[in-house]
Design a protein with these regions (language model features):
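Anionic group-transfer/hydrolysis microenvironments
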Residues: 38, 87, 133, 157-159, ...
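Active-site loop/helix belt of alpha/beta enzymes
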Residues: 3, 159-255
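A charged N-terminal "starter" segment
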Residues: 1-151, 187, 191, 196, ...
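Glycine-rich, aromatic-flanked loop segments that form ligand/cofactor-binding clefts
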Residues: 149-161
């Protein structure tokens, strides 16, 4: 699993980003988690450039807080121009306390509490990603009490099997996350959201799963999501501007 920031000296000493890991272990103890800031920044820039090249200047890749949620990581993401998604008030607090711009934060999760909703609204975050009818109604109430209009995306399930590990497959029709396109539940949720005066529905989000190694999964997802956006326009007269395709690129956990 050696990558271009991991090497061995002629004496057989393992190095990471140019540092002798045995010396780091002596200085900081073990277990010790090492991250290469230069590599992280380079990856951010790669994604940002690819998005600009293929999706235009209005596109934005998001860093998933579940990967590593601590202040320095959020500072790096802020400096590199990334967005972030969070799934708890704790992650939101950490991002904000690191100075991450609230308008580039997306609050995900299918079990948000009233306290989560109130905290996010009070901090002026960019988007809530609403998962179900109950959340929509609760968020409408919270936004009305705060006298604000909150931007949202709706999470829907496209019915895609990414052929990954079952526990991290999230886009199938029977997923616990989001409303299914296939059953009509997603359209019902869209129509409800459009009636709520303190919610500004901007688009849709879906997440097909983690450990996705093939780009064909995203093409199949687009083949469902784009026609669904068209059907929303046909049935409601509203053109939604945002399409957020979620999913985790595969990581080599074994050699």
């Amino acid at each position: 699993m050696l990558s271009n920031n991991i090497d061995r000296t002629p004496e057989g000493v393992l190095t990471f980003a140019g540092y002798d890991v045995t010396q780091l272990a002596k200085e900081y103890g073990t277990p010790l988690y090492l991250m290469d800031e230069a590599r992280i920044r380079a990856n951010c820039r790669m994604y940002l450039q690819a998005f600009r090249d293929h999706f235009g200047p209005g596109s934005l890749p998001l860093y998933a807080s579940k990967a590593a949620s601590f202040k320095q990581m959020y500072r790096i993401m802020a400096e590199e121009g990334m967005g972030v998604d969070v799934v708890s008030s704790g992650e939101l607090y950490t991002a904000l306390s690191a100075g991450f711009p609230a308008e580039r934060i997306y609050f995900h999760g299918n079990c948000k509490t009233d306290a989560d909703l109130a905290y996010g609204v009070s901090q002026g975050i960019g988007f809530f990603v609403a998962d179900n009818r109950e959340e929509l109604l609760a968020l409408e109430k919270t936004a009305a009490e705060a006298n604000v209009t909150q931007k949202i995306l709706l999470r829907v399930t496209p019915g895609i099997d990414p052929h990954t590990y079952e526990a991290v497959s999230t886009g199938k029709v029977d997923s616990k996350f989001g409303a299914a396109v296939e059953t009509g539940q997603a359209m019902e949720l869209v129509k409800l959201a459009l009636t709520l005066p303190h919610l500004d529905l901007r688009g849709l989000h879906c997440h097909v799963g983690s450990q996705v190694f093939g780009e064909d999964v995203y093409q199949r997802t687009l083949d469902i999501m784009v026609p669904f956006l068209a059907s929303i326009r046909e049935e409601t007269g509203v053109t939604l501007s945002d399409l957020n395709l979620g999913g985790g690129y595969g990581v080599r956990y074994t050699a």
